[in-house]
Design a protein with these regions (language model features):
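Transmembrane beta-strand segments that form the barrel wall of outer-membrane beta-barrel proteins
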Residues: 1, 22-35, 39-42, 54-58, ...
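Residues on the lipid-exposed face of transmembrane beta-strands in outer-membrane beta-barrel proteins
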Residues: 2-10, 42-48, 95-105, 120-122, ...
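Transmembrane beta-strands of outer-membrane beta-barrel pores
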Residues: 6-12, 31-35, 48, 58-64, ...
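Repeated loop/turn-to-beta-strand initiation elements of outer-membrane beta-barrel proteins
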Residues: 12-18, 50-54, 105-115, 162-171, ...
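Outer-membrane beta-barrel translocator domains and adjoining extracellular loop/strand segments
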Residues: 39-42, 57, 66-73, 127-137, ...
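Outer-membrane beta-barrel "beta-signal"
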Residues: 95-96, 237-266
Length: 266
């Protein structure tokens, strides 16, 4: 996937003290392109205090099918992963609150920059081609999306070191995602398919920077997954699967991710 971002930052309610001197409003315009989808995002980030961000975003996208991959599909029990190329729009909105702190503020120096970042957010997504409680697939994922709300969290513990020339920071990244709208539909403790399951993603991350305009994020990610019974794990549609209530989840290695960013000069 390729992303193009244009950002505009304006001063906002700035004060004379260290907590408010950098207050601003940032507006991001982002285009996202893949072989099976196109998506546009407008995001606004308010910084009312040095350690606090408030963000909101809206998005609009659609998808098609190419090389056996579905950008957009319905995932019904009667017809799993039915492609619906360009037949629907995926509309989204999100709200989040981020707290961040650098311990280098308390103990100034080149070796004391330990950063802690935590964000809690709510996301809403709507596939205009999907009915109520009908699961759908987006960007060739597992096809377990629903029209409605999800709750997500991100936590980062990172260290900035002056000892390594290319390494800007390294640390541990934790992310979670949980369905709210379908939470009680088929819960884990009742042996359902796990509508209340919280995805957890955890792994080390390294940020490389060079030349003033180039950066590369490297991440190795582990994740939790639902553990189904032996009798149901092979069923094609997840509605027909049943949780193993004795051992409902397990960890697995999910991916190695590389994200390159180039910042154009003004």
């Amino acid at each position: 996937q390729v992303k193009a971002v244009r950002s505009y930052t304006l001063p906002w309610l700035r004060g004379a003290g260290p907590l408010t001197s950098g207050n601003n409003v940032e507006v991001q315009l982002r285009g996202e392109f893949s072989p099976v989808s196109i998506n546009t995002v407008v995001r606004t980030i308010l910084t009312p205090l040095a350690f606090l961000n408030i963000d909101a975003a809206v998005s609009l996208g659609t998808g098609w099918t190419a090389a056996g991959l579905n950008g957009l599909a319905l995932n019904t029990m009667a017809d799993p992963f039915e492609p619906i190329p360009l037949e629907g729009l995926v509309l989204g909105t999100s709200f989040g609150l981020t707290g961040q702190f650098d311990f280098g503020v308390l103990v100034p120096g080149d070796w004391t920059h330990v950063a802690v970042v935590y964000r809690a957010g709510l996301d809403y997504r709507l596939n205009t081609a999907a009915g109520e409680a009908v699961p759908w697939q987006w960007l060739a994922d597992a096809g377990e999306n629903f029209n409605g709300w999800t709750w997500n969290q991100t936590a980062l513990l990172a260290y900035q070191t002056p000892a390594l020339k290319l390494v800007d920071a390294f640390g541990v990244l934790l992310e979670t995602n949980q369905n709210i709208t379908q939470f009680h539909e088929s819960p884990m403790n009742e042996g359902g398919w796990g509508s209340d399951f919280m995805e957890v993603f955890l792994g080390p991350i390294v940020v490389l920077k060079w030349g003033g305009s180039h950066s590369l994020n490297i991440q190795f990610q582990f994740a939790t997954e639902r553990d189904y019974t032996d009798e149901s794990v092979g069923n094609e549609h997840f509605f027909y699967r049943r949780m193993d209530t004795a051992n409902p989840t397990y960890w697995y290695f999910r991916r190695a991710a590389f994200s390159y960013t180039f910042v154009c000069s003004q």
